[in-house]
């Protein structure tokens, strides 16, 4: 039997995103920032984080999302017909610090794929990473700039994130 445990409820997620928004604004003071969510749940979190950052700055910042289906290094070992979403990056990356947003950081392979996909659209001034949960167990030298919750897990455990789309 698999044991299920809620680690962050909706209020916790909201408070965590508010904190991360403050950190993003503080760390990037005076520099143009754009948020890019990694499909699927990262895109929902990026939308929520975007609104908070815009409210703090009292201005609009670019928001996009990126699909990494064809950039994954396990593409051949997954389903033969990967689910592909359109990426939406309607701004020049070169002008911005791009904050990649994802739900859970685990091995780092998703982030590696997202960075590769991002650079196919241009060369950002810098790239930062914001995650709701960091599980550890990295296989690549990837470290988040903004972490909602450090969540040590066994490799055999799963972390499921359920977020309401805004």
Language model features with spans:
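PRPP-associated nucleotide enzymes
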Residues: 1-166
């Amino acid at each position: 039997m698999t044991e299920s445990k809620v680690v962050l409820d909706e209020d916790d997620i909201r408070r965590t995103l508010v904190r991360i928004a403050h950190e993003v604004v503080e760390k990037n003071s005076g520099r143009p920032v754009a948020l890019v969510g990694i499909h699927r749940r990262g895109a929902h979190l990026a939308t929520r984080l975007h609104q908070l950052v815009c409210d703090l700055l009292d201005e609009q910042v670019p928001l996009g999302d990126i699909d990494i289906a064809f950039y994954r290094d396990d593409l051949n070992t997954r389903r033969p017909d990967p689910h592909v979403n359109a990426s939406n990056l309607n701004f020049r990356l070169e002008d911005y610090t791009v904050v990649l947003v994802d739900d859970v950081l685990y091995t780092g392979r998703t982030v590696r794929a997202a960075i590769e996909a991002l650079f196919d659209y241009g060369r950002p001034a810098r790239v930062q990473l914001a995650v709701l949960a960091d599980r550890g167990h990295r296989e690549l030298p990837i470290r988040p700039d903004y972490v909602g919750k450090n969540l040590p897990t066994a490799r055999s455990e799963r972390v499921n994130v359920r977020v309401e789309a805004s």
